[in-house]
Amino acid sequence: MKLLFSFLTALFLFFQSDLDALRNSYEKANSSTANTQIFINIAEKQTGSDAVTSAYKAAAKIMEAKIVTKNRKALVKSGATSLESIIKNNPNNVELRVIRMSVQENIPKIVGYSKNLKEDKMFIIDNYSRQNPALKTYIRKFAAQSKTMNAAEKNSLR
């Protein structure tokens, strides 16, 4: 059954662009360990070095800490450091803020990587109208399940 699921996922993702594949697998990554592993595999196979692809790779490194038993702290630290560096070099990229906000919402609070939630939320809301239609749809999907955005903020993303 897992083999069939993996095959269908691979087939589906083959016909998508690399960025679409990353986005789609990232959306589902927190729903199960299998989906987390699929996202990590897709991220690792990416050859692009653009900021968005690199940010998804950093998020994959952080998420890998959820499913491994060794080096968890090192994975989180390395991924978070990479993600922060990417955002520092691309401060006006909304998708990078969505990625960081998502990571910070889903990482255990004890890790201490949640200081940018309010900042990223406001940045996303303030810059939403200037994004392309595909990214707007992605942001709305993220906002719908966000723990940081309230109902009014979610409704403002229309």
Where do the model's predicted regions map?
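Terminal, low-structured helical/coil segments at or just beyond the last alpha-helical repeat
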Residues: 123-158
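Structural register within alpha-helical repeat arrays
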Residues: 57, 62-64, 100, 138-139, ...
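Helix-turn-helix repeat elements of alpha-solenoid scaffolds
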Residues: 27-41, 72-80, 113-114
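Bacterial Sec-dependent N-terminal signal peptides
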Residues: 1-21
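Short coil/turn linking the two alpha-helices of tandem helical-hairpin repeats
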Residues: 27-30, 58, 63-70, 106-111, ...
